[in-house]
Amino acid sequence: MKQYVIVFLTLLLSAPLLGQTPDFVFSNTNGKIPVQAYKGYHYVKFPFQSKVTAYVTLKGEDTESVEVFPKGKVSEVNQIQNTVSIALYEPGVYMLRLNKKHKFFIFADEPYSLPTDKPIINIVDLGIDNTGRENMTSQIQKALENASGSGAVLYFPKGDYKTFPLTIGRNTHLFLDEDATIMADTSDIKRYYPTDDLGTKRFIYIKDAENVKIHGAGSINGNGKVLRTRYGDEARMRLMMIFRSKNVDIEGLMFKDPGSWNTQILCSEDVSFNAVKLMNDIELSNTDGFDPDASKRVLIENCFAYCSDDNVAIKITKTSGYMQNVEDITVRGCLFLTKKSSLKVGTETRGLLMKNILFEDNDVIESDRGMALYVSDGATLENIRYINNRFEYNYPDAKRCGINFVVRKRNKDSKLGMIKDVLIKDCFFENSFPKMSEIKSEAKGLINVHIENLYIENQKVSSLSEGQIEVKNSNIEIK
């Protein structure tokens, strides 16, 4: 018989004052778990052991509406006055939306533990400060280099590790404990200037590496808001850059506060992200989530991203001249919120072919555009599948449409590309988006889309008008 863990979450809201932050309390049978506040929303993390019943109480404000996401994973939601109870039967990411404005995220992760079959190197035992007061760049970099190829796990216990950019090499295994944070030093932007031919600033750099594993319940914090405020556009940097690497596995971590795109995967193969949480500053421009760029066999699964820009943008940027085709990208089982596009390919499509891309079983809670395909630089998009994705609310930004597929020339010298063999199947828009969806091309015969079992507000779409889809020079089949 499964052990039942009772979890109590109390949301304490006094009559709100200007600028006042709500107070939250979260506890279970093992005691209180600290609640984190970040940019107008709150979250809590804990290891999921068995069924969890959560109790949510909103004080100082009547609980007039309650929504819990993903809807398909939460079946037992009850309310007594201002208290809401929720039964969680499996690990994952859950979101509460109270009175259509208060967001609370629960990260109930699979428990992470140090491997027992490998030697462990505790980085603190190497004399490295974990108070966050001292910069430890050279010491941590040396530890990374020594761990590379050693067969040992480099272990970061609880604490704050302040550093400038770090490079992770081949055959490296890192484990970040819960409450362990690798944090970007904000004192000198020049230390982030690239020193190789890849002219992109980055904090954590995995370059020319194979067999890299980084996992655990810890965090990597780019301090992007502070850096951008202090240094402006100079501080637009990737929190993580994976470049020309193979067999990279990232699991369980939280990537927080990038200065620009959170994670770029450039010219790499066999890269996976599982249960990774991207927490971007939603008021900071250009903070994409996951950006697979000229890469092959990338898996993004059971992840979370809250972004000011695209949640996922699969592209070929030709960064510093590096370019190859895109193949076999899968985004599955994730929960996303964004002010821009959520499930996107493009806009940069500077290669020849981008094929075999699957978006499956994702929950998009907020987006300006749910599904987006943009070809502006002449590439061909082939075999793009949107299967069993759910879209809840429109975020009021530039386009405000559920589907936006466009083939155009970026400039007069650009070539026209193609979007072919696109399948939208078993996808649901809980609410209609305010503007018409668009599927448009500058010339005929360049876009082919098959739509099957598309629902808007519980009504099956059987025509372009019912789907609120405006079409130009495109072949669309609906059934």
Role assignments for model-derived ranges:
Residues M1-Y4:
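Positively charged n-region of N-terminal signal peptides that target proteins for export
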Residues I6-L9:
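Sec-dependent N-terminal signal peptides
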